[in-house]
């Protein structure tokens, strides 16, 4: 039996941490249990709201929204609703605009009935409107329920906008357990991605001095451990296992809200996912669930970390390497296409690839290399273990299974780091001149696996 999470330990108060910062979240209520839908009216009233605005899509309304509305009717709570008709919802300007236009100004709180995309849309729109929002979760598919950021696609670029956390997360375990298994395995993939993102965060702390909190890292590790332990029961849709996994996803989100950004839960594995998502959207392809892509990205990043452990560097020679900005810019334009201006603007601002900055990082990398090797060994399970775990649950473990070609794998490894100003393994590989080589290696690795 997995260790139980008591999420109430993190709610309603601030914590002075050994990292020197005060941690707190504005999340007030978490109710993930049997028949939680019947308690939705009570939670709305407890928070002092009179008229919620329910936001769903055709799938989540059928799965949970209609039942939630029925409970509100019985309780005598007036509400308005907006149901997206699109079967594949894209969180872009058009979708956000349609939601803002449909909003009823006599409502005093927004309730997202759904998971990832609906949560991001409601998180951002409520923040812009100066309203609070709640989540009635329909699937344990990702860990962004209570993160402070809203992931949207603007000007063709996947961008995280500062927003706020919901005041409540409600999840009925019967509804959560009945969700398509693909969405459950997506949640597992999102959580397993924490193995690599936490290592990226620690590496950034060692090499760049970026803020790092071991307490928050331990919170995320606890979430990962629970999901791994529950993975055998989750395949059978065991309600207790679904509850544990959903609470682990919420815990990961609380960790993000403590930091104020997604650093404890998003690293190079997410950047690969973002790149594939942007390419799929540009080409008009059906979106792949976020956590499914993250799980595959995690395998790729773990494999690259394993390979990095065996490298030996001539740091003096590395510092002499030049950077062909024109070639980089051409590659960005060729691959990112309509999103390229935003990517180039980010580099002009962040200067991630500035040679003076690179050489300062290389000097620290040389000095800290033994510590970095120890950190890698202590932090990661093997890529083979992760492949077996995901495969046992029926989750994709190879990019080819989700329609990502070898070329797209290679391009993602080379260019995904440009999506964010965030130091990860991909920047280490660029700094050390290994990025193109590792891109080919990972593409070949998955290509061979796909042909077996």
Where are these regions (language model features)?
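A glycine/threonine-rich phosphate-anchoring loop and its flanking beta-alpha core
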Residues: 128-226
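Active-site segments that bind and position negatively charged phosphate/pyrophosphate groups
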Residues: 219-370, 375-385
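Generic secondary-structure signature for well-ordered alpha-helical cores
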Residues: 73-77, 101-104, 157, 168, ...
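ATP/NTP phosphate-donor binding region
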Residues: 2-109
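C-terminal charged capping/lid subdomain of soluble metabolic enzymes
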Residues: 2-17, 309-452
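A short, small-residue-rich loop immediately preceding and capping a beta-strand
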Residues: 103-139
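Solvent-exposed alpha-helices and their adjacent loops that cap or buttress functional pockets
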Residues: 22-23, 47, 102-105, 126, ...
